[in-house]
Amino acid sequence: GADGIELNYGCPHGMSERGMGSAVGQVPEYCEQITGWVMQVARIPVIVKLTPNITNIVAPARAAVAARANALSLINTVNSITAVDLDTLEISPNIGGKGGHGGYAGPAVKPIALNMVSALGGDEVVRASGIPISAMGGISTWRDAAEFLLLGAGSLQVCTAVMHYGFRIIEDLCDGLSNWMDSKGFAS
């Protein structure tokens, strides 16, 4: 069985057009309602993954807290179009004559992620709930990791950097973060 469930309210990949993914994360009432349904039957931890494709990240976070989610994760990818082919005049990438938007990730989204983690870390309702925050979005180095932790994250997720540099990056990240924490006198 699974150790947990992540409700992905942030996916921009072809789901938002059908009222799923990031469309759910943009409507706090939907976020609370669906999370509540899952919490009624789940016997394992439920994490709500929030979309960055919203003006106020606090509203869906508070909705997830109200529905008693076990944790929050953020940010998912930023809805984007990466290019337009100037020869074919079509959105790129294009498969079978169809192009579309997708999710933008990696170091370029880090400032957005830091801002949103900070908003949740500083929100009185989210903070008072004690709900864990797991941060992602542009984490490539131990310095990136430290910034997210200082703004309110209790755990981190790294994907794009691992895809680019391999799993070795995690050991470097952990070593660098540990050394920095020791130099600052942080125990945890």
Regions found by a protein language model. Name each.
Residues 40-51, 122-136:
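Short beta-strand/loop segments at the ligand-binding rim of alpha/beta enzyme cores
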Residues 2-5, 42-46, 68-70, 129-131, ...:
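Short, well-ordered coil/turn segments that N-cap beta-strands
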Residues 9-11, 67-82, 138-139, 144-172:
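Glycine-rich phosphate-binding active-site loops on the catalytic face of alpha/beta enzymes
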Residues 12-29, 60, 67-129:
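Glycine/Thr-rich beta-alpha phosphate-binding loop at enzyme active sites
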Residues 31-36, 58-62, 117-118, 145, ...:
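Generic structural signal for well-ordered alpha-helices
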Residues 83-101, 149, 161-186:
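C-terminal helical cap(s) of enzyme catalytic domains, especially alpha/beta-barrels
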Residues 7, 49, 72, 120, ...:
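Conserved, mostly hydrophobic/aromatic
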Residues 54-67, 118, 122-129, 139-156:
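Catalytic cores of alpha/beta
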